[in-house]
Amino acid sequence: MLQPTRLKYRKQQKGRNTGIATRGNKVSFGEFGLKAVGRGRLTARQIEAARRAMTRHIKRGGRIWIRVFPDKPITEKPIQVRMGGGKGNVEYYIAEIKPGKVLYEMDGVPEELAREAFELAAAKLPIPTTFVVRQVGQ
């Protein structure tokens, strides 16, 4: 699973996910992409589950790029622990997703196969997505 190797700070504040994606909003590596329409957070497990679903569907053909990385630590307190006593331990990592962000890209497969693969991947993700094709001149 994806997670940062080193962090400057082990724990992070929650923050707010606002605005739209100004970076990473175009298909730049492959021919087809899966773009987020809504906002939310993807855990490392969800990113990996969607990748596996796509990889299994396209079999040996094509190439897949993951355009998001879970770099934000999420902490949780153990069960039946009273309030206070400091911030909990880091349990998993998430990637904050803004509308317009390209999550995955694919190349080397027919459009119909790419659509089907992205549909399977989208079913594993908690945010609404859409299929996009690379524009000429990008």
From Swiss-Prot:
GO terms for cellular component: cytosolic large ribosomal subunit. Gene3D superfamilies: Ribosomal protein L10e/L16. It comes from the Bacteria. One of its GO terms (molecular function) is tRNA binding. GO terms for biological process: translation. PROSITE patterns: RIBOSOMAL_L16_1 (PS00586). The keyword S-adenosyl-L-methionine does not apply. Belongs to the universal ribosomal protein uL16 family. Part of the 50S ribosomal subunit. NCBIfam families: rplP_bact (TIGR01164). This is Large ribosomal subunit protein uL16. It comes from Neisseria gonorrhoeae (strain ATCC 700825 / FA 1090).
